[in-house]
């Protein structure tokens, strides 16, 4: 079965094509992405209207490249991110997917963007066993219990304020590093001393929810430090901030796996590309005897391949197609795998 999937939840226009074999194996055939990030950079963040217009312009050419790469004429299924995400951006991808579904007379699946991030790892490491999932991106930070990609995902905890990726962008802006801030801040942090400045770790007290996160206080602490220490090394500030984020994320994720008695930790989402998070997760999983799975950096960021993978797992589990009347949902919770 050939599955074509569209991703348009934010500022990446992605088209992925995957093959679902009879034994449940999912093979990636094409992964094409067009980004409008440069158009948003001068505004210091994503502008929803610009993102929607960019999807309209990029979707056709990206679709053609994906079909050519895969050598596919007509897929057996069309899928799309139906939420969460920017309302206008989602509408572009969902409307296109429905149109292709109707024109090709094949089923349509509207699936969850966040589940897609988890499913991306399958391309690199094969079938996913029962896992604790740490999903970290610009708009989301969740701890999840993933029994399988075809079953409902259970949320263990999430951020009570800023997402981890959002904190990265805000601190990068504070340091004058521009937007998007994730990679440039990561690069700067590698030049600094992560022990030189110790920033607070939110939600880590004995009375705090062990599976909840908070990064607003950390962001404020960095701002106050920079204001009161104008001579401070930017590299040390970046390293101290990054260490605080990676410390909290990995500490809570490993604790969740140990609490549930699960032997695999999956880290996914855009922030999963961060070098220190990957390094510290590897160290702590080794100490705890856990298997760590993180997709290659390209599959951590938004793409259509991950949506194709998640749709494939839902189909293999017997999920019904979504009706063409299904509406996109900008606030779709992670526990809803699809809109059916």
Curated annotation (Swiss-Prot):
Required for the formation of a threonylcarbamoyl group on adenosine at position 37 (t(6)A37) in tRNAs that read codons beginning with adenine. Is involved in the transfer of the threonylcarbamoyl moiety of threonylcarbamoyl-AMP (TC-AMP) to the N6 group of A37, together with TsaE and TsaB. TsaD likely plays a direct catalytic role in this reaction. Its cofactor is Fe(2+). This is tRNA N6-adenosine threonylcarbamoyltransferase. It comes from Mycobacterium sp. (strain JLS). Its main location: cytoplasm. Fe cation binds at residues 113, 117, 302. GO terms for biological process: tRNA threonylcarbamoyladenosine modification. Its EC number is 2.3.1.234. Binds 1 Fe(2+) ion per subunit. Substrate binds at residues 135-139, 169, 182, 186, 274. GO terms for cellular component: cytoplasm. It holds the Pfam family TsaD. It is found in: Cytoplasm. Belongs to the KAE1 / TsaD family. SUPFAM superfamilies: Actin-like ATPase domain. It catalyses: L-threonylcarbamoyladenylate + adenosine(37) in tRNA = N(6)-L-threonylcarbamoyladenosine(37) in tRNA + AMP + H(+). GO terms for molecular function: iron ion binding; N(6)-L-threonylcarbamoyladenine synthase activity. Keywords: Acyltransferase, Cytoplasm, Iron, Metal-binding, Transferase, tRNA processing. It is an enzyme of class 2 (transferase).
């Amino acid at each position: 079965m050939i599955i074509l999937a569209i991703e348009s939840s934010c500022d990446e226009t992605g088209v992925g094509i995957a093959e679902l074999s009879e034994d449940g194996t999912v093979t990636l055939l094409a992964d094409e992405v067009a980004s409008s990030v440069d158009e948003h950079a001068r505004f210091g963040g994503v502008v929803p209207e610009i993102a929607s217009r960019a999807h309209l312009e990029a979707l056709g050419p990206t679709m053609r490249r994906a079909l050519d790469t895969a050598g596919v004429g007509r897929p057996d299924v069309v899928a799309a991110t139906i939420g969460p995400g920017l309302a206008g951006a989602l509408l572009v991808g969902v409307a296109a997917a429905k149109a292709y579904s109707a024109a090709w007379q094949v089923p349509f699946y509207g699936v969850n963007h966040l589940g897609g991030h988890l499913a991306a790892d399958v391309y690199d490491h094969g079938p996913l066993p029962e896992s604790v999932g740490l999903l970290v991106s610009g708009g989301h930070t969740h701890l999840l219990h993933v029994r399988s990609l075809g079953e409902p995902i259970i949320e263990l905890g999430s951020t009570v304020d800023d997402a981890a990726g959002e904190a990265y962008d805000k601190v990068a802006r504070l340091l004058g590093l521009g937007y998007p801030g994730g990679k440039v801040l990561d690069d700067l942090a590698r030049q600094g001393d992560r022990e030189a400045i110790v920033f607070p770790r939110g939600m880590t007290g004995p009375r705090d929810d062990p599976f909840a996160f908070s990064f607003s206080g950390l962001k404020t602490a960095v701002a106050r430090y920079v204001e009161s220490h104008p001579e401070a090394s930017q590299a040390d500030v970046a390293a101290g901030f990054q260490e605080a984020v990676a410390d909290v994320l990995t500490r809570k994720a490993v604790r969740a796996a140990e609490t549930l008695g699960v032997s695999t930790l999956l880290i996914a989402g855009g922030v999963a590309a961060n070098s220190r998070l990957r390094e510290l997760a590897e160290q702590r999983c080794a100490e705890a005897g856990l298997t760590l799975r993180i997709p290659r950096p390209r599959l951590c960021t938004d793409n259509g391949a991950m949506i194709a993978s998640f749709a494939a797992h839902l189909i293999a589990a017997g999920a019904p197609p979504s009706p063409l009347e299904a509406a996109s949902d900008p606030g779709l919770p992670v526990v809803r795998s699809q809109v059916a």
